[in-house]
């Protein structure tokens, strides 16, 4: 067994956990790039998911949620980009069911162990002939090709892999995600997948995933729009042979920290790859009255178009930040707010302080920007991630036609 460091977990090169296989290919949904893939475990896996709150929830999202809610297990997922299969009516629903049946037949498992995930253009029907013809081309590999098959306007895949020891057994967690635009999640974000060979019951995994998604994926924003297809799914097949994880144990805490890290890293990678983005923006709020207040303020700041535009312009415009704070319904003291940008104090007790404008502007040329807010009004905190707003965001979305 690999000897781990003294940390609870460590990052490692991309690899699938024991028993997981995948593939990603091109079947003509996109012009040239990979657009179709699968991910499966050789044994049924405990499954958990979080899903978009958009009322026009897409057929694949509804279907996968139904399967996980019914049995807390999945064994395979069929994935595609380019076409979202959203707002497609009864035909879209039947197409999702057909995809499920085809993959179940290919894997020789019950249909209720199969989920479906789609992303892309809303309103178009899937070309089922291409899906059917593409299925035989999918092979069980250990490559990362599937991480490319779900991309749309993304510049690159988002992946992370960590390992930890649970009761002496080496456990791997591997996650990948897609997302660049239409990112302002509520309960989930774009498409995200985490696989692990840890042993954990589905309901326990669901509680853990939901809590961690709220603190990570739900705290990023690129453009304030919540997709119809947002979904985060976690699969745990138990092949690491650790004792089943239970709340209140050391193993549970270690795994929970590892899962939080994986989700957090994927969330930050998505924010950094926002459409047209040149800078990742992180906001930390401390001494808030409640965690909700801290999270609300942090997300409002990174989501403010005025703040995002100022960061693109490399302008430490703290007035836009404090105005955004005041526009929330958070419980604050308007006389006690401190604001720092990249470690430089701009505002103390809600009043301007002298600072070296040129020095601050120089730090804003970096591709990672940190905004720190101290409310001096409690003991809670919040964190959120976003990106700058650039000319290219408008260009990309103006040229994305139906």
From Swiss-Prot:
Biological role stated in the UniProt entry: Catalyzes two activities which are involved in the cyclic version of arginine biosynthesis: the synthesis of N-acetylglutamate from glutamate and acetyl-CoA as the acetyl donor, and of ornithine by transacetylation between N(2)-acetylornithine and glutamate.
Highest rank taxon of the organism: Bacteria
Site (Cleavage): 188-189
Source organism: Lactiplantibacillus plantarum (strain ATCC BAA-793 / NCIMB 8826 / WCFS1) (Lactobacillus plantarum)
Gene this chain is encoded by: argJ
Alphabetical list of InterPro entries matching this protein: Arg_biosynth_ArgJ, ArgJ-like_dom_sf, ArgJ_beta_C
Family: Belongs to the ArgJ family.
Name of the protein in its database record: Arginine biosynthesis bifunctional protein ArgJ
Residues that bind substrate: 152, 178, 189, 275, 397, 402
């Amino acid at each position: 067994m690999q000897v781990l460091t003294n940390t609870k977990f460590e990052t490692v090169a991309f690899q699938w956990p024991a028993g997981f296989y995948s593939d990603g290919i091109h079947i003509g949904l996109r012009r040239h790039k990979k657009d179709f893939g699968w991910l499966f475990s050789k044994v049924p896996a405990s499954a958990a998911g979080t899903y978009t709150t958009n009322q026009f929830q897409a057929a694949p999202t509804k279907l996968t949620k139904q399967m996980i809610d019914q049995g807390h297990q999945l064994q395979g997922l069929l994935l595609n980009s380019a076409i979202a299969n959203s707002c497609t009516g009864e035909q879209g629903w039947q197409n999702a069911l057909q995809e499920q049946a085809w993959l179940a037949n290919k894997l020789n498992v019950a249909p209720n162990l199969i989920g479906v995930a789609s992303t892309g253009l809303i309103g178009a029907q899937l070309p089922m002939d291409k899906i059917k013809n593409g299925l035989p081309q999918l092979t069980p590999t250990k490559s990362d090709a599937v991480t490319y098959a779900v991309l749309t306007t993304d510049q690159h895949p988002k992946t992370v892999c960590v390992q930890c020891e649970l009761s002496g057994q080496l456990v791997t967690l591997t996650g990948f995600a897609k997302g660049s635009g239409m990112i302002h999640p509520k309960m989930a974000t774009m498409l995200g997948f985490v696989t692990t060979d840890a042993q954990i019951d589905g309901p326990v995994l669901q509680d853990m995933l939901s809590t961690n998604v709220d603190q990570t994926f739900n705290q990023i924003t690129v453009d304030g729009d919540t997709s119809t297809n947002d979904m985060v799914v976690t699969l745990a097949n138990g092949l690491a042979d650790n004792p089943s994880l239970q709340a209140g144990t050391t193993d549970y805490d270690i795994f929970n920290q590892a899962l939080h890290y994986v989700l957090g890293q994927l969330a930050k990678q998505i924010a950094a790859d926002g459409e047209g983005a040149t800078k990742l923006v992180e906001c930390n709020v401390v001494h808030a009255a409640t965690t909700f207040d801290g999270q609300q303020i942090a997300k409002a700041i990174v989501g403010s178009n005025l703040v995002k535009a100022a960061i693109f312009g490399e302008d430490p415009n703290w007035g836009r930040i404090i105005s955004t704070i005041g526009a929330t319904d958070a419980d604050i003291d308007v006389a006690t707010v401190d604001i720092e940008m990249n470690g430089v104090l701009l505002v103390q007790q809600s009043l301007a302080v002298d600072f070296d404008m040129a020095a601050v502007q120089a730090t804003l040329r970096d591709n990672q920007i940190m905004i720190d807010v101290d409310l001096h009004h409690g003991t809670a905190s919040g964190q959120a991630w976003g990106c700058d707003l650039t000319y290219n965001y408008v260009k990309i979305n103006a040229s994305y036609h139906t």
